[in-house]
């Protein structure tokens, strides 16, 4: 049996620092050295897409952690003047694309394509207009950027641009070339990655029995709505609906992967304490998130990896 190892990384904005620190700690554990080298496919959404591109490009985890610690404040840099011009964040995205573009060009290269990456990747985005000349086929649709061989791939796409596409979270950043954050349909892209392993257009296709999948979250806050009946309209629903849908999407992907892979699937999705809520742009919480990730009990994940990921 030849294992096919898939790493899936959720979206979560600046909370990606939690994932970066968790991966650092895992890579430092005895018996797990070089676990990233064994990856066959990395799939990611939003900040998870940036992590996936960085790993596939060959960046070490210290560089990737530095991206969040040093460059995060530049990317999520907002001023009172920007807010004023955007009418208190009611018009226009919160942040400009230019700082993230500069950072991604620096770390991924100006002209590095997906085809030049050292690992297979599957990066989620959403195409706002497929521009099909047939009006009966013109629509918006999910887009999965990948560098698998064969027809229909995206090997020519610039890596930094794909990073911009997957990270263009609505209200936070403008769309880029008509694409927005894949988190609108796959904030947890694990099922996307699993499905990609079975695409018969790309040979050889691994047996499902050979696939092992490690899914990493970025740190979650728990939400709930009290009561049993909610006769609400738009105003009441708009605030909880986004978190409700993102959590639902993530949860159903977790369910599907567990049902299909059983013990060959593992999800590491840490939850912040009940009193802690961290928006995806809260750069002031970076020190807290680092401490949080450094104190997590990773022993269940370490045991699973030694048994299913590292073992031949």
Question: What are the roles of these predicted feature ranges?
Answer:
Residues 1-2, 171-178, 184-186, 205-208, ...:
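C-terminal helical/tail subdomains of lipid-metabolizing enzymes
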Residues 4-8, 14-104, 161, 293:
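Patatin-like phospholipase
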Residues 11-14, 47-50, 58, 128-130, ...:
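Conserved beta-strand elements of beta-rich interaction domains across eukaryotes
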Residues 12, 48, 104, 123, ...:
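Conserved small-residue
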Residues 77, 83, 115-199:
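Active-site gating loop/helix substructures
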Residues 85-89, 93-120, 144, 176, ...:
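Surface cap/lid and interfacial helix-loop subdomains adjacent to catalytic sites
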């Amino acid at each position: 049996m030849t294992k096919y190892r898939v790493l899936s990384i959720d979206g979560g904005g600046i909370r990606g620092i939690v994932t970066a620190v968790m991966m650092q700690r895992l890579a430092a554990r005895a018996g797990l050295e070089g676990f990233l080298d064994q990856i066959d496919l990395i799939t990611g959404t939003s900040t998870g897409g940036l992590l996936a591109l960085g790993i596939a490009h060959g960046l070490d985890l210290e560089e990737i952690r530095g991206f969040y610690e040093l460059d995060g404040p530049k990317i999520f840099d907002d001023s009172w003047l920007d807010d004023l011009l955007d009418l208190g964040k009611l018009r226009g995205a919160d942040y400009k694309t230019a700082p993230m573009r500069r950072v991604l060009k620096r770390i991924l290269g100006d002209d590095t394509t997906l085809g030049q990456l050292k690992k297979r990747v599957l990066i989620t985005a959403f195409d706002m207009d497929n521009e099909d000349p047939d009006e009966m086929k013109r629509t918006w649709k999910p887009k999965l950027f990948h560098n698998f061989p064969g027809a229909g791939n995206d090997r020519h796409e610039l890596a930094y641009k794909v990073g911009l596409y997957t990270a263009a979270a609505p209200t936070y950043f403008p769309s880029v070339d008509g694409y927005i954050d894949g988190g609108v349909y796959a904030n947890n892209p694990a099922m996307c990655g699993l499905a990609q392993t079975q695409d018969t257009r790309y040979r050889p296709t691994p047996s499902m029995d050979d696939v092992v999948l490690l899914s990493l979250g970025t740190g979650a806050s728990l939400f709930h709505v009290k009561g049993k009946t909610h006769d609400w309209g738009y105003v009441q629903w708009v605030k909880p609906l986004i978190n409700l849908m993102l959590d639902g999407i993530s949860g159903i992907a977790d369910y599907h992967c567990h049902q299909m892979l059983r013990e060959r699937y593992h999800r590491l999705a840490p939850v912040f304490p009940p009193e802690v809520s961290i928006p995806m742009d809260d750069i002031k919480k970076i020190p807290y998130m680092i401490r949080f990730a450094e104190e997590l009990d990773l022993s269940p994940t370490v045991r699973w990896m030694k048994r299913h990921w590292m073992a031949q």
